[in-house]
């Protein structure tokens, strides 16, 4: 049935959390036939978010949908080590209330950070926030945007407009990191499936500083 790139959303002493979205043949097969079985996994490949880059700073995380998965580790780390930074805010967006991932985590994280949890649309009577993640960028409570750090993960258009909003708020390009989700195959930079310009997402990324990443949006 082939292979599929999967986001690592958590690591423990003897386990790894994977966030799998059912979107095609391979992931559909995992959901249908292999519950409780052992599957072959290779990797991890590429880079990740280094928490040292965000220590002693105000940090803003903007994530859309399954884009929350790769930033879950950063949020979890600073929720347990709040003294290592100057303040943290997360804006997380989902299509609908039923699509919200990691609900238990959000309840814990909001104890140590400002949390904007929003959905694109909801039925009448929904009491949470409704709107795109960019709607809440003007509401960020920051002491100094020019020294704050930001992580943005999600679909290309969402990342493009989120970064635009951050720059308008006074963030510097060198203080913004983006992560690209692009179809990967070999994982070692040989097949070219994930090539954007002269970069290979599986080798050079998927995390890029925006000074590099701004030239890679496709």
What kind of feature is each model-predicted range?
Residues 44-54:
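A short, basic/flexible loop-to-alpha-helix module at the beginning of a structural domain
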């Amino acid at each position: 049935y082939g292979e599929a790139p999967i986001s690592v959303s958590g690591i423990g002493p003897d386990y790894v959390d994977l966030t799998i979205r059912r979107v095609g043949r391979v992931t559909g097969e995992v959901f249908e036939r292999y519950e409780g079985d052992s599957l072959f996994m290779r990797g991890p490949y590429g880079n990740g978010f280094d928490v040292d880059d965000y220590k002693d700073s105000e940090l803003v995380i903007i994530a859309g949908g399954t884009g929350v998965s790769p930033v879950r580790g950063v949020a979890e780390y600073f929720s347990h080590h709040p003294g290592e930074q100057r303040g943290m805010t997360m804006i997380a967006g989902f299509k609908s209330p039923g699509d919200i991932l990691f609900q238990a985590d959000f309840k814990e994280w909001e104890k140590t950070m400002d949390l904007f949890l929003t959905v694109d649309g909801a039925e009448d009577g929904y009491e949470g926030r409704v709107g795109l993640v960019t709607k809440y960028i003007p509401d960020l409570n920051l002491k100094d945007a020019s020294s704050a750090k930001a992580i943005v993960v999600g679909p290309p258009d969402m990342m493009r407009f989120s970064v635009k909003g951050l720059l308008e708020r006074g963030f510097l390009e060198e203080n913004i990191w983006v992560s690209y989700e692009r179809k990967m195959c070999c994982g070692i930079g040989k097949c070219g499936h994930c090539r954007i310009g002269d970069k290979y997402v599986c080798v050079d990324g998927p995390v890029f500083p925006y000074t590099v990443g701004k030239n890679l949006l496709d």
